Amino acid sequence: IVLFAATLVNEKYPAVTPASELFRTALKADNGEEATTKTNLLKQAKLIKCSGETNEKEVARYAVDGDVKTKWCDTSTAPNYIDFDFGKEQTIRGWKLVNAGNEGSVFITHTCFLQGRNSPDEEWKTIDELSDNKKNTVVRQFKPTSVRYVRLLVTQSTQNNSLKAARIYELEVY
């Protein structure tokens, strides 16, 4: 379905909203709080590093491309991670993770951490921890915190610890 909208104005130079500000996602937190609309800050962030990529069809940038049909896959030794730079400090309050449950429930990320820091010289600090996860799509909220850099750190990539493949279809940070 494609929707188009137009507005007629009498102004010579009407205000324009960048397309990037129009990308928003409606969320309902796992704790049942009311749905809110958030902007995915990773859409504007620079991907600066990852632990690995399985092949050219499963690269790290696919974890934040907004397409749940593409994914980042890393079969290197755990922990697996993907790092982003917002370019400046941002206040974040939550995140969304879409796992590979569509490939089988065994591929749902079991344990991971959202981490942050404000300088490349600082140690990563855990902002939120997801453990013993069984959900394919997870939405989490936490106390607002300001960071410049954010990392998804996957320590147990699957439900069966003998399988070693981090498979992330989408990662969003708000």
Model features per residue range: what roles?
Residues 1-27, 37-48:
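Extended hydrophobic/Leu-rich segments
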Residues 4, 10-22, 58-126, 132-174:
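Aromatic, loop-rich ligand-recognition surfaces of beta-strand-rich domains
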Residues 27-65:
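Predominantly extracellular/luminal regions of secreted and cell-surface proteins
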